[in-house]
Amino acid sequence: LDAAIADAAVPPIARATALELLAPYLSAHDVPAVEQALRDPDPQVRRAALALLDAWEPPRRWQTGAPLLADPVRSVRLAAVDALADAAGTVTLPESQRATFATAVAEYRAAQMLNADRAESWLNLGALDARLGHADAAEAAYRRAIDTDPHFLPAYVNLADLYRQLGRDGDGERVLRQGLTVSQEATLQYALGLLLIREQRREEALTALGAAANAAPEVPRYAYVYALALDNAGRRADAIAVLEAAQRRATGDREILTALVSLASQSGDTAAAQRWGAALQQLQTSAAEPR
């Protein structure tokens, strides 16, 4: 993928797609390709590269991405705000950069308000304010998103996560249960399950996490977390069964394989531990090969 990203002969849309495909496998090996993509002449490539900066530490993210706050293309500037909002507070900014950032943030807000009748715009504003550390404004924006479209489920999840960060899981549970009256969708069940684990309400958590894993079997993370919760509840055989089923659907998932190795080892099943360990080693070897 790195070679395709760096090859100017490859069409821009293909290079942007290569950057999107790189996201789950991003490593230090890929840094030069991402940095080069941030300077690419085509704006869709620059936008795709900005989306990868979340994996970097905030100070480095700011240092690398800040020039794009003044990009000549508006959509790139907006993507830069999204990528850098929570990084700005981690570095001491000279006056010129503070002004550039403030201008870009104002432009981002104005762009969202053009579609203020859509819940997605309020979600975006809430996420921006949350990353800027403006908790009250973020809460109000997420509430506005829910009021605008009660069936827009990401707003419930984001608001509950904001409450988690604020130490208000009681409010978060109420929000998620409100969302579940609209839809039993997996993301709501998963978020509720994690909240209930934090609250030490394990049986309720297992019910919610199991519902998420069953509703969205294509998402390995749900099965992984559900299996860990089962194991912590003393149900190792059930946990292994959940992981094995998930592994059959997602053969290249590192977390699933790692958990299978761990649980097989703890169970004294040497043959299974070796089998899953070999699969994990093969996956790691493939990931280390140049893309």
Set out the residue ranges of the language-model regions:
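Hydrophobic/aromatic packing residues within the alpha-helices of TPR/SEL1-like helical repeat arrays
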Residues: 108-109, 142, 176, 209, ...
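Amphipathic alpha-helical scaffolding segments comprising HEAT/armadillo-like alpha-solenoid repeats
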Residues: 1-5, 27-39, 57-69, 91-107, ...
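Structural marker of alpha-solenoid helical repeat scaffolds
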Residues: 25, 40-41, 56, 71-72, ...
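Register position in tetratricopeptide repeats
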Residues: 55, 86, 131, 165-166, ...
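Residue-level recognition of tetratricopeptide repeat
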Residues: 73, 118, 152, 185-186, ...
